[in-house]
Amino acid sequence: MDSTFSLRRLAVATLLCASPALISAQAENKAAALQSCLTTAGVRNVISTDATWADETTGFQKRIKVDPAAISFPENKDQVALSLDCARNASTSVSPLGAAHSFQAYGFGNPGSLVISMAAFNSVSFDAATNRLTYGGGTHVGPVLKYLWDNHGRHFPHVRGAHVGLAGSSIGGGYGSSSRHLGTPMDNLESVEYMLYNGTIVNAAKGSDLFWAAQGAGASYGVLLSVTTNTHKPLFETAVNFTINGGQLDSTAAAKAVIAIQDFSLSKDCPDELALRWSLSGPPYTGTGYFYGNPADFDTVIAPLVTALKAIGSNATVAKTELPFWDMEVAVAGAGMNQPNGGTLGGRSFYTQALTITTDHPLTEAQAKTLYESTTIAFNRTDLRKSGFLDLWGGVSRDIADADTAYAHGKNLWLIRWEANSVDATSYPADGTTYMKGLIKPFEDALVAGGAPLRGFVNYADTELSEAEWSSRLYGSNFDRLKQLKTVYDPEGVFVNHKQAIPLP
């Protein structure tokens, strides 16, 4: 720690000794107080009166309007610590913002928060002795995966968006096309480097309480400086990208198709190397899949499923394309895999709901029929566009218990996503979220009636849930442990920074 940094922390600390009148003035104008403190500390920052504010507060999610007090742009660890000092002096929460994608805008924090942009933390390094990759807290999916592939011919599971923040999507569960046989991005993590609320840097390794908490609730405990993950060499140089067209099915046939896929996935005929995303918004009902086993075996592997689907709809068809492994990565996550920063931000005004189904409570045909009838078939809006899918999970999750990570995802079999995008990208209908919640409610009721607990997905946070609902769906019985760990690593609640952050007990 150099003397300049020490002097700057001292200068910031003197603000704690300011007169009561000054403290009162700071409380009345938190943004100005934060800007003054950050400027004194030598950390670049913006507040709402600055010309770049609109650009800096633009995220992927357009439905939720963000309102932080200030954003700091630290260029190194010392400046992250100074940013934390300023936030504590102003008695405001801190929200680390990774790659600034922020699917549900939670990266921009609660109103009045200090957002710490991690954009400068975009380094990547590879340890050939362990085959582990370390990436900064501000990296995007595309550039990191391309670096790893171009330089080392290796891969690790990741979400299906090249521009998405890699750290945030990985600690939020993450689910990708190779997750059935390699695990989720979160399952592949080896360690995380945190800066805690008081500027202390901790390397939390697998097996530690803090690492466990990071796997599903990472943004609630500190600033992620870097993340280390295990990597894998593909078994084959090529992979098979395939599509299934189930045709124009009614709700009964659509439900039967889902159960046919489920039965196939649980049979000895389905290898973990096969992934499938099946459409919820239809008809027609289609699937996009990826096969990472021996390409020569694909026709034999898929045959039992094709036979089952043809028995439901005689017009069911399968088409396939064999691609070099990296080309498959681009097919999965988009052209941004070959572009700086993973391409462009884009964005929509949308509301997402997500549920996971486990092997302990697989879908019944009646439940699947309720899902289709109450959502995509019942949908009747002209100001919203429906969207939805069922990701086949299963695979290696059979060996995971809910208590293994903060996010309870043991034995997950399906990841179901149901959402609606506003036709007007600048706003969302006032009754839109209520309408969409009403559509999925019969399916939720059917799950509960069948004895299944409602489970969610961290990366697809349902912003309209109460604390009792989201804590149960995401963390289950792990929630009490998470709150206890909060008292150890964030006793001042600095990182109680959004609606679904882990609170103090």
Language-model-derived ranges and their functions:
Residues 1-27:
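Fungal secretory targeting signals
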Residues 23-505:
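Soluble FAD-dependent oxygen oxidases
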